[in-house]
Amino acid sequence: MTTAVTQATIDGFFDASNGDPFATLGMHETEQGIEIRTLLPDANRMVVIERESGKEITELDCVDERGFFVGVIPNCRQFFAYQLQVFWGNEAQIIEDPYRFHPMIDDLEQWLLSEGSMLRPYEVLGAHFMECDGVSGVNFRLWAPNARRVSIVGDFNYWDGRRHPMRFHPKSGVWELFLPKASLGQLYKFELIDCYGNLRLKADPYAFSSQLRPDTASQISALPNVVEMTEQRRQANQANQPISIYEVHLGSWRRNLENNFWLDYDQIADELIPYVKEMGFTHIEFLPLSEFPFDGSWGYQPLGLYSPTSRFGSPEAFRRLVKRAHEAGINVILDWVPGHFPSDTHGLVAFDGTALYEHEDPREGYHQDWNTLIYNYGRNEVKNFLSSNALYWLERFGVDGIRMDAVASMIYRDYSRAEGEWIPNQYGGRENLEAIEFLKHTNWKIHSEMAGAISIAEESTSFAGVTHPSEDGGLGFNFKWNMGWMNDTLAYMKLDPIYRQYHHNKMTFGMVYQYSENFVLPLSHDEVVHGKYSLLGKMPGDTWQKFANLRAYYGYMWGYPGKKLLFMGNEFAQGREWNYEESLDWFLLDENIGGGWHKGVLKLVKDLNQIYQKNRPLFELDNSPEGFDWLVVDDAANSVFAFERRSSNGERIIVVSNFTPVPRHNYRIGVNVAGKYEEILNTDSMYYEGSNVGNFGCVASEKIESHGRENSISVSIPPLATVYLRLKAK
């Protein structure tokens, strides 16, 4: 036996306790010459071959029958490139020895990782194809600073943790191993001995591809190439442009009729993209597509943040879906969940035995609403892991924006917690200062590295400055969901029209704070699940009134300042709640089944999108008081509202809504500019299955004072309807 290696050291490899394999394995200088030591459980013989010439150098001695081999090359003083001829019974193969290769992570990379200032840590950590000393392979790296030992296991080594223990870099807490001949598509995990001596089998947090549940392995996959931002996509994201978002859950938008199984990314591209284009939406927003273990979470409890879910195909197929959207002139937004993660054992929980990604104290680290764990945003490596993930989706898949989920739960330490269930910040306050800094940092990274991409916050409180620049003390988002507007207006619409007069302010209150943030008006998936009923189901009255109410509400929403978001199925007034396990009720568009009602709503949404895109007053000055003026704000008795939308070049559209089933004929509205106003939309049109009350295409102003204005128009406002009147150019 070699005197340089003790039996205890050898035993450490086989009981998986040796955390420094490169100190023993590979080439080492000794007094007698270069000594080569290898670990290959179950091998019978081992011969060293000079790589360049193919010449046999020496046969190694088996010093431990479990598979530890040693041999000295006498008088050899220089390291050289070699291969190993391994004999397994009667079979032999020539392999590269992973332990002859030098470290590939440099000091600067380690420093940047530890500082949390590496812009793209996914280019360093995880599994990456590369070449070392002329040998192709995959370099695996994992951050697990408190583990005693880490091995890479997978299809390439029979999932045997003894075979490929990794090199530890104490400066950064990163483990590394270059594995020659590892190939695309092979499955792998990291086997850790944690700080307490427990064995843990973990998926790669930076994996670019992962198995479909219930399997949990990572898959070797190439880092996708960068997708450059185009001027067309950048322009479509601007605050002065029309943004109408179709929110989609890919697993239930449409399914295979034969087996109710999911469509794949390519099938979705074939069917969804033309539909969205035809309907006039400018953006698609996908519910989260990072790999997640539980279907019922809809993607909002992800574990494989860098892996597009394999439910619908490969990462390459998802890139094709995004590309197809861009070719159709549609931008793509992705729901993104940096607020919490599930406690599945193969994931991030207690990763190296310590609370590495989460907080140790459940008052900070446990989310009781969702039974999930909360990220430790104060840890550099965790903050960087998350913020760079947003950039990854934008750069590597061409996604045009992210919608950040549950921001309120991140920025408040007492979110959904009773007294005594949370820990104040260092100043005694309730704000999560580390999370706030993380949000600012993430938005800075997005906007500095991917100019033109947008970030949208789902933030349900009145936290100030969500869409203000970070240099002005804001969080730096481009847009914020207007949850207040959504809750108020839906509460109003649920009321029987006879009672709406007593809640008139619910439809007007949003303008009090309209210019405090840049808003998106969201009718999202959250409003059509968990016993809340569908949007149609929320509307009062008989069938005619339900559909009329919904059409009037949509008209009001598309006329109101703010970008638009509509969850799938609402564009044709699906009657039942959304079910993530089934396709939407497309059969309702069959007039023999739906009676034409649903098709009428579909036509309306399509027309609303077209009118919205073609008329600058409806979108250009959403965030400026110059773009809006109440004309009728106080007619609670009749539940009538009228306001004017304006563009920067003087174009004007008047939006008039009547939320009672009583038509209002000869209703006088004061106008700011005298002239003729053409009716460009009427939600009561027979084309939408309405009663067809209207204004015969046009109304002219008269010099009759009304609502404090010298001129006015007399209009017929249909029952439960919204009308758009556009000032005709002179």
Curated annotation (Swiss-Prot):
SUPFAM superfamilies, per the entry: (Trans)glycosidases, E set domains, Glycosyl hydrolase domain
Its EC number(s): 2.4.1.18
InterPro entries: A-amylase/branching_C, Branching_enzy, GlgB, GlgB_N, GlgB_N_E_set_prok, Glyco_hydro_13_cat_dom, Glyco_hydro_13_N, Glyco_hydro_b
Cellular component GO terms held in the UniProt record: cytosol
Catalytic activity: Transfers a segment of a (1->4)-alpha-D-glucan chain to a primary hydroxy group in a similar glucan chain
GO molecular function, a single term: cation binding
Active site (UniProt): 405, 458
Segment forming the signal sequence: none
Listed pathway(s): Glycan biosynthesis; glycogen biosynthesis
Enzyme class, spelled out: transferase
GO BP terms in the entry: glycogen biosynthetic process
Record keywords: Carbohydrate metabolism, Glycogen biosynthesis, Glycogen metabolism, Glycosyltransferase, Transferase
PANTHER family, sorted: 1,4-ALPHA-GLUCAN-BRANCHING ENZYME
Role: Catalyzes the formation of the alpha-1,6-glucosidic linkages in glycogen by scission of a 1,4-alpha-linked oligosaccharide from growing alpha-1,4-glucan chains and the subsequent attachment of the oligosaccharide to the alpha-1,6 position.
Subunit structure: Monomer.
Entry's family note: Belongs to the glycosyl hydrolase 13 family. GlgB subfamily.
Stated name of the protein: 1,4-alpha-glucan branching enzyme GlgB
Native source species: Haemophilus influenzae (strain 86-028NP)
Gene that encodes it: glgB
